[in-house]
Amino acid sequence: MDIAKIMGYLPHRYPFLLVDRILELTSEEIVGLKNVTINEPFFQGHFPGEPIMPGVLIIEALAQTGGVLAFTLVSDFRGKPIYFMGMDKVRFRKPVRPGDQLILKLKILKRRGPTFKMSAEAFVEEQLVAEAELLATIGAAKSEREA
């Protein structure tokens, strides 16, 4: 799935869209890609002279990739937000630097209606750099919330 299709699912835009491509997608799993470049705005201050992608943004990239998976499983997702509800078992294993390709792998552990619990792992060159369990839910469309 290319960036145009991803943007059809996610409301995020530059500089906060953190998934560039979907490499694999099934009804239970997704694999995404984030090309990490020196042009990322966060590298200006994190850290000058030794740029490292902030761990919370690795988690956000995982969450966005999981959002694409969730939205593909809901037929009437248009106009509905996805809310990040929580994270557990978060671990950062290695730094992510400019030039890295971040591979984002998520698998549904549990689904109850519009709520999803997913295992999430991020890799660089087949080495685990971060992992977590993420919880998210698809909310009501704005028109439904205003009614």
UniProtKB/Swiss-Prot annotation:
Instruction: Write the Enzyme Commission number(s) for this entry.
Output: 4.2.1.59
Q: Sorted alphabetically, which keywords does the UniProt record give?
A: Cytoplasm, Lipid A biosynthesis, Lipid biosynthesis, Lipid metabolism, Lyase
Choose any GO biological process term that the UniProt entry carries and state it.
Answer: lipid A biosynthetic process
Q: Which organism is it from?
A: Syntrophobacter fumaroxidans (strain DSM 10017 / MPOB)
What's the name of the protein? 3-hydroxyacyl-[acyl-carrier-protein] dehydratase FabZ
Q: Which Gene3D superfamilies match?
A: Hotdog Thioesterase
Enzymatic class = lyase
UniProt cross-references to NCBIfam families, sorted A to Z: fabZ, PRK00006.1
Primary location? cytoplasm
Cellular location(s): Cytoplasm
Primary role: Involved in unsaturated fatty acids biosynthesis. Catalyzes the dehydration of short chain beta-hydroxyacyl-ACPs and long chain saturated and unsaturated beta-hydroxyacyl-ACPs.
A Gene Ontology term for the protein's cellular component:
membrane
Catalytic activity field: a (3R)-hydroxyacyl-[ACP] = a (2E)-enoyl-[ACP] + H2O
Q: Where is the active site?
A: H46
Enumerate the GO terms in the molecular function aspect.
Answer: (3R)-hydroxyacyl-[acyl-carrier-protein] dehydratase activity
Q: List the disulfide bonds.
A: none
Protein family per UniProt: Belongs to the thioester dehydratase family. FabZ subfamily.
| Lineage top rank: taxon | Bacteria
